[in-house]
Structure formats: structure tokens, C-alpha cells
Amino acid sequence: YYDLINPINACILGKPKWDTTKAYWSRHVATPDGWTFVIPTYPESPSHDYCVGYCYNSNITKKEVAEFNFLNQFDVEVTKHIKFKNYVAKEPVIDGRIFLNGNRLFFLEPMESSSTQSYLEVAKAFFDYYLPGKVNLNQIKTNTTQYMKECQNFILWHYQAGSKYNTPFWDYAKSLTFEIDERFNRYVIWSSENDNYDTLPDQYGGLGGKELYGQWPAYSFRNWYEGMNIKLNT
């Protein structure tokens, strides 16, 4: 496996003591130790006990300290501690007949919830392999590796501007660099020089076409700029 660059390697899951269904979207909340996701979930759902997650780096923050901070900032009951690595398989196809997907293929922290769409994209690539003349095994390997690197880059980009916290975690997160490829630069320029309509994918009524960086259109890059309150050229 190759390591994917990311500042997060652990998460504390919690059961919320408030009604998360009052919100219509998931939240990503910056914390001194990393960030926390809050997913609107009905109490009767099996995932309700795990719908709040305190993501942090265990090499920077001890588990006990992270749990204390989690409970101090969010009204939850701690239900589980997990540690993980961020990785992608060197060989997504084994012996020309075994196709890796799911956690056998890769794992990347939960920001942007990229897993499910990635699984679908990889499954489509494997299906295309069985359609004569569409793709070969080398293309699948190259495309899969490139796709996961683009997912890594887009997520890592979120950390580059830091947060309101001046802490060891955020110093570390901002220090992580990634190889900015030509496509990334093109999306950055495209999103900063065009308005929402021009960057929105055409299937949603815009003029942005169907091309994606990883699984994100130029519109997502533009939203990043606006979320960071960065003045654009439009």
C-alpha cells in the first residue's frame, strides 16, 4: 500500500444528547485537535450512536486528552475509539482477475465523505474493463491511483488555510504539502475566474461540463474559496 497524505489518524465516536435532525446537512466543525463531524441522524437509526465524530491525530494529542476535549465541546456520550491509516493499494488488480474495492483498495479520512462515490467510480472502471476495447488493466491501475491522489489533494487542501485555532495540530496540518498537478491548478484558476453558473456541472443546469477533479467539479473549488472568504476575480 501507498500512504495517502493526511493529518488525521484517529476518531472518537459519540452519541449526541440533542436532536441532530433539526439540521438538514452534516456539519464539519474545526476543533483545537482537528475537526468534528455531526451527521443528522434519527435516534432509531443504528448509526445514531456514532453520528458525531471527533477526528484528531493520535501522534499529537493523547487519546485521553482528545476525549476530554470532545466531551468539553460537544454534548455527547462517547461510544467508540478508532484509529486508522490513510492508504491506497499499489495494485488495484491482482492476477488480472481480482479487483480490489472498499477498504481493501483504500481508506481516506471522512472529510468530504468521499468513500461511497469512490467505490462506485472504481466499480465502473472494473465494469469497463469487461467491455472490449474500453480500458486495459494498466489504465485501470493508473486511473485508480490518479483518482485517489486527486481525492487526497482536494481534502488536504481544506487544511491549508488552517483554522481559528493556533495549536500543534493545525501547525502540523498546514505544514503538509502535496504535489499540485496541472489539473488541480486548472480547476483553481477556472473556479476563481468564473461565476457559479459557469462552474456548476451541466447536469445541474450550469455550464461547467462533466469533467471532475477526483469527484469534484470546479463549482466545489469555488465553494472552497467562498467558504474561506477569499475574494474572487468575478
What feature does the model see in each segment?
Residues T21, V78-H81, G133-N138:
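Acidic/polar loop patches that form or flank catalytic/metal-binding clefts of enzymes
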Residues I5-P7, W25-W35:
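Conserved, well-structured functional cores that handle cations and Mg-NTP chemistry
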Residues Y1-K22:
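Central beta-strand plus flanking loop segment that forms part of the substrate or channel wall
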Residues A89-Q152:
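Conserved mid-domain beta->alpha element of the FAD-binding
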Residues D128, P132-T234:
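Long, low-complexity C-terminal extensions of enzymes
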Residues T21, Q73, Y129-Y130:
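Extended charged low-complexity segments that act as oligomerization/scaffolding linkers
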